[in-house]
């Protein structure tokens, strides 16, 4: 069952070491901090074996520069906590894809990332390419 706070929701893909988050509309820094801590609390049991993260951004509004900075911090924390790959479901939004790519680059973590139209495509990629 998904945990929710404002525009953010977080859940685990059953039977997989994958955390899925989804955003709808406009978010803010407080919601993003909640999101980060919620994902970290779920994923802590997989730190040594590794886990993957899917961000469903397809229904989100673009983020502000300050919120983008919070997402960079989130990326660093997730990688430190054992996250092996980030998959982004961005629908048809080029702007969301560019923002996600820039935030990952700014994190300087070198984490594997993929960009897709749907969550299903992201899951298929994680199964076939990342093997978590």
Give the role of each language-model region.
Residues 1-132:
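Amphipathic, Lys/Arg-enriched alpha-helical "gate/interface" segment within cytosolic domains
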């Amino acid at each position: 069952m998904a945990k929710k706070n404002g525009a953010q929701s977080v859940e685990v893909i059953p039977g997989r070491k994958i955390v899925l988050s989804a955003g709808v509309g406009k978010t803010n820094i407080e919601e993003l901090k909640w999101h980060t801590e919620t994902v970290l609390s779920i994923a802590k049991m997989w730190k040594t074996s590794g886990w993957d993260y899917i961000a469903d951004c397809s229904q989100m509004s673009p983020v502000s520069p300050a919120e983008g900075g919070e997402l960079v911090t989130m990326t660093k924390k997730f990688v430190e906590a054992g996250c092996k790959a980030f998959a982004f479901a961005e629908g048809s939004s080029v702007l969301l894809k560019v923002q996600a790519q820039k935030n990952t680059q700014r994190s300087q973590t070198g984490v594997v990332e993929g960009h897709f139209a749907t969550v299903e495509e992201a899951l298929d990629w994680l199964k076939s390419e990342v093997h978590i």
